[in-house]
């Protein structure tokens, strides 16, 4: 039974999402989960748990936000629960050294001239387009693993700086440096691809 059929079966009218859109959301959720847990099978399990939870709680979906926003919030909570259960967010052994593969900066931490970011230009609606999010995902995947995970913890999982520092054993200064570099690299990548 498809998700749309299931919704119809439950008597919930939701004609704003098709099976194709649902598959696209699922793919995005899987990518998001894989960035956090770094294991394809585990990411798949978390996405399935998020969908199962959504199925069980469809009657509680008040449509105050988009379906995608709602189900991503469920996934974020599942990931946070898993990571807290495991007692870690990022294992040092899973991370690349911050200086490894970081070709955007010189040894003093300054931008290399060829990679210095330009200002993002363009229409506001670019941020909301599917193309933007595909490019963003590509740029995010180009970040070193440590930067990508910490960026996702802060911006997508919305964890506080204190919580991230506690879980990753980073100092506040190192955290802010890592986030700053991640944002700059994302800005550089996006400015070249948009």
Curated annotation (Swiss-Prot):
Superkingdom of origin organism: Bacteria
Keyword Membrane: no
DNA-binding region: 161-180
Alphabetized PROSITE patterns for the sequence: SIGMA70_ECF (PS01063)
Stored InterPro entries: RNA_pol_sigma-24-rel, RNA_pol_sigma-70-like, RNA_pol_sigma-70_dom, RNA_pol_sigma70_ECF_CS, RNA_pol_sigma70_r2, RNA_pol_sigma70_r4_t2, RNA_pol_sigma_r2, RNA_pol_sigma_r3/r4-like
GO molecular function ontology, one term from the record: DNA binding
UniProt-listed GO biological process terms: DNA-templated transcription initiation; regulation of DNA-templated transcription
Chain span(s) of sequence motif Polymerase core binding: 45-58
Family, as annotated: Belongs to the sigma-70 factor family. ECF subfamily.
Protein name: Probable RNA polymerase sigma factor HI_1459
Origin species: Haemophilus influenzae (strain ATCC 51907 / DSM 11121 / KW20 / Rd)
């Amino acid at each position: 039974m498809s998700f749309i059929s299931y919704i119809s079966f439950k008597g919930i009218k939701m004609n704003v999402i098709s099976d194709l859109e649902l598959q696209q959301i699922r793919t995005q959720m899987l990518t998001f989960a894989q960035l956090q847990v770094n294991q394809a099978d585990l990411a798949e399990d978390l996405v399935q748990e998020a969908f199962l939870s959504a199925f069980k709680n469809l009657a509680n979906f008040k449509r105050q936000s988009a379906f995608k926003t709602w189900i991503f919030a469920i996934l974020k909570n599942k990931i946070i629960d898993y990571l807290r259960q495991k007692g870690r967010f990022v294992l040092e052994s899973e991370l690349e050294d911050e200086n490894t593969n970081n070709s955007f900066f010189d040894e003093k931490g300054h931008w290399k001239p060829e990679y210095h970011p330009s200002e993002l230009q363009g229409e506001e609606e670019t941020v909301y387009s599917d193309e933007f999010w595909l490019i963003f995902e590509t740029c995010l995947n180009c970040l070193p693993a440590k930067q990508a995970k910490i960026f996702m913890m802060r911006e997508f999982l919305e964890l506080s700086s204190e919580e991230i520092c506690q879980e990753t054993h980073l100092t506040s200064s190192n955290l802010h440096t890592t986030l700053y570099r991640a944002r700059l690299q994302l800005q550089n990548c996006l400015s070249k691809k948009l």
